[in-house]
Amino acid sequence: MPRPVLLIHGGAGDIPDSRIAGKFKGIKEALRCAWGSLVPASGAKGGALDAVETAVRSMELDENFNAGYGSCLNTDGQVEMEASLMEGQDLRAGCVTLLRDVMHPITVARRLMEKQRHTFIGGEAAQELALSTGSERLPANALVTEGARFTLQQFKEQLTQGKDPFFARTELAAEQKTDPSGETVGAVAMDHNGQIVVGTSTGGITGKWPGRIGDTPILGSGTYADNARGGVSTTGHGETIMRYNLAQRILAAIEHKGMSAQAAADQECREMTRRIGGTGGAIVVGHAGDLGISFTSQRMAWGYIQDDTIFYGIEGQVVHQEPLS
């Protein structure tokens, strides 16, 4: 019987020192919230699907991350969100994009996967699905934080100076060291049955055009789950990740080259940056339950639970740990 695994990330980019504490707090809180869904205290078998949704929902509520509340703003100063969710047994998936004024895009993606006949919808259709299946319509700008406004202001100031930080090729442009907004979030889980589920949610990138769609809702780029190979959630410069098809390439390395989750993630993240120039990262759970955590950006917040211990980090090989309970 497989050992349950839960691995999450809170985004890759040029994350300043001032935001590390908030990232760590949010990562640990999401892990604790979701672990009970994966490994119930009663000893009953938990589910990877519930665990992934719970972890991502927790981070969507936290302004330290770029998903849900605290999402980045487009050039019009509005939040447009996207998310995807995928199960590895039957390859079911739900992908949504261009959502506005709802708190949990990951839950909308789950409703699409479980109850509808389409796999990917966006804009008005995604909005209608969200509101017709139980999501509350939030007041206009309820998801906008002061940090996100400040970052957009910085972005526009750089444009007037002839610089476009969108092409810095990180999820957070290098010049925006004081950026208090967050990064894409994701989770990968394997339950007692060997079921692998992956979920990813984001507000995109500051200063994007209205209507821009990134890698997060695209299967094979931002998210992919296959019980026979593993599960991957990615983060970073979306245009780069889409062009490289990062999630699928990592799983192909596991399947065709016999690589471990860690080796496959390292190889493909490095090759993506070498070929295209953009940076990013990925978390991976292999079909055997092994973990992979890799990034070419300056930092990437991540965490997982193993042997009643939370392990977490944000840079290099530095690993922190503390008891789960």
From Swiss-Prot:
The entry's keywords: Autocatalytic cleavage, Hydrolase, Protease
GO CC terms: cytoplasm
Molecular-function GO terms, alphabetical: asparaginase activity; beta-aspartyl-peptidase activity
Binding site for substrate: R212, I213, G214, D215, T235, G236, H237, G238
GO biological process terms held by the UniProt record: asparagine catabolic process via L-aspartate; proteolysis
Domain of life of the source: Eukaryota
Entry EC no(s): 3.4.19.5, 3.5.1.1
Disulfide-bond pairs as recorded: none
Keyword Thylakoid: no
Enzyme active site: T184
Post-translational changes noted in the entry: Cleaved into an alpha and beta chain by autocatalysis; this activates the enzyme. The N-terminal residue of the beta subunit is responsible for the nucleophile hydrolase activity.
InterPro entries reported for this sequence: ASRGL1_meta, Ntn_hydrolases_N, Peptidase_T2
SUPFAM superfamilies: N-terminal nucleophile aminohydrolases (Ntn hydrolases)
Quaternary assembly: Heterodimer of an alpha and beta chain produced by autocleavage.
Family affiliation: Belongs to the Ntn-hydrolase family.
Role, per record: Has both L-asparaginase and beta-aspartyl peptidase activity. Does not have aspartylglucosaminidase activity and is inactive toward GlcNAc-L-Asn. Likewise, has no activity toward glutamine.
Protein name: Probable isoaspartyl peptidase/L-asparaginase GA20639
